Amino acid sequence: MNNRVHQGHFARKRFGQNFLNDQFVIDSIVSAIHPVPGEAVVEIGPGLGALTEPVAARMDHMTVIELDRDLAARLASHPQLKDKLTIHQQDAMKVNFSELSEQAGQPLRVFGNLPYNISTPLMFHLFSYTDAIRDMHFMLQKEVVNRLVAGPNSKTYGRLTVMAQYYCNVIPVLEVPPTAFTPAPKVDSAVVRLIPHVQMPHPVGDVRMLSRITTQAFNQRRKTVRNSLGDLFTSEQLIELGIDPILRAENISVAQYCKLANWLSAQSTPQK
């Protein structure tokens, strides 16, 4: 038997398709999302509808974004779902979530079993729309969830950590074994909840500066920040900002990265 075939659909590797089939896990995720009628719920990558069906059962309407043409057509003809779904057959990386929120007249509740091959860039795409999002629940590779929730001074702490925690409160929800999927992935999975901050704990004037600094620091994470960020800050400036120049990227907190970004923005702004 071909283990890439599930419910008559052949899982496409290029789309990173692994279909959830464990009812306990499905029920646990739906309980964590806790959808309520009237909310603007958006699912990314509904696939064969393992999560779509129980969520839609609690809703009058929901929106789904599915890249696979065959799966989108299958959902459109699903007897229990077709009248409840607005289906966008497109790449979620190209979706304007602010427009979806404006159309709904409220912030979005986004969830999905994300294809692991695009999960990180997709989250960065979503971070740019956090003003339009109430919360997000995602099934991800466990290693990615570990990075999202990491603290400073750990090997899993990186640019994704800093940017995710800048935008959101990040909460691990559930660990999921490979046996919960068809075909079974070669890695463990986990569900995470991301709640965009209503008030930023560490406001940054220009988030592009934060992105630039974190990219530069973590691209050279074995170097001290005196070296990795040497073209942006002198050792004396780092010390004045409360950062030891001999620390490495993983030793700098989210708050400290935000402080660096704001200082650099201030230096780049022409004085009146």
From Swiss-Prot:
<dbReference type="Pfam" id="PF00398">
    <property type="entry name" value="RrnaAD"/>
</dbReference>
<feature type="binding site">
    <location>
        <position position="66"/>
    </location>
    <ligand>
        <name>S-adenosyl-L-methionine</name>
    </ligand>
</feature>
<keyword id="KW-0698">rRNA processing</keyword>
<dbReference type="InterPro" id="IPR029063">
    <property type="entry name" value="SAM-dependent_MTases_sf"/>
</dbReference>
<feature type="binding site">
    <location>
        <position position="20"/>
    </location>
    <ligand>
        <name>S-adenosyl-L-methionine</name>
    </ligand>
</feature>
<keyword id="KW-0694">RNA-binding</keyword>
<dbReference type="GO" id="GO:0031167">
    <property type="term" value="P:rRNA methylation"/>
</dbReference>
<feature type="binding site">
    <location>
        <position position="45"/>
    </location>
    <ligand>
        <name>S-adenosyl-L-methionine</name>
    </ligand>
</feature>
<feature type="binding site">
    <location>
        <position position="91"/>
    </location>
    <ligand>
        <name>S-adenosyl-L-methionine</name>
    </ligand>
</feature>
<comment type="similarity">
    <text>Belongs to the class I-like SAM-binding methyltransferase superfamily. rRNA adenine N(6)-methyltransferase family. RsmA subfamily.</text>
</comment>
<dbReference type="GO" id="GO:0003723">
    <property type="term" value="F:RNA binding"/>
</dbReference>
<dbReference type="GO" id="GO:0005829">
    <property type="term" value="C:cytosol"/>
</dbReference>
<keyword id="KW-0949">S-adenosyl-L-methionine</keyword>
<protein>
    <recommendedName>
        <fullName>Ribosomal RNA small subunit methyltransferase A</fullName>
        <ecNumber>2.1.1.182</ecNumber>
    </recommendedName>
</protein>
<keyword id="KW-0963">Cytoplasm</keyword>
<keyword id="KW-0808">Transferase</keyword>
<feature type="binding site">
    <location>
        <position position="113"/>
    </location>
    <ligand>
        <name>S-adenosyl-L-methionine</name>
    </ligand>
</feature>
<dbReference type="GO" id="GO:0000179">
    <property type="term" value="F:rRNA (adenine-N6,N6-)-dimethyltransferase activity"/>
</dbReference>
<feature type="binding site">
    <location>
        <position position="18"/>
    </location>
    <ligand>
        <name>S-adenosyl-L-methionine</name>
    </ligand>
</feature>
<dbReference type="GO" id="GO:0052908">
    <property type="term" value="F:16S rRNA (adenine(1518)-N(6)/adenine(1519)-N(6))-dimethyltransferase activity"/>
</dbReference>
<comment type="function">
    <text>Specifically dimethylates two adjacent adenosines (A1518 and A1519) in the loop of a conserved hairpin near the 3'-end of 16S rRNA in the 30S particle. May play a critical role in biogenesis of 30S subunits.</text>
</comment>
<dbReference type="InterPro" id="IPR011530">
    <property type="entry name" value="rRNA_adenine_dimethylase"/>
</dbReference>
<dbReference type="InterPro" id="IPR020596">
    <property type="entry name" value="rRNA_Ade_Mease_Trfase_CS"/>
</dbReference>
<dbReference type="InterPro" id="IPR023165">
    <property type="entry name" value="rRNA_Ade_diMease-like_C"/>
</dbReference>
<dbReference type="InterPro" id="IPR001737">
    <property type="entry name" value="KsgA/Erm"/>
</dbReference>
<dbReference type="InterPro" id="IPR020598">
    <property type="entry name" value="rRNA_Ade_methylase_Trfase_N"/>
</dbReference>
<keyword id="KW-0489">Methyltransferase</keyword>
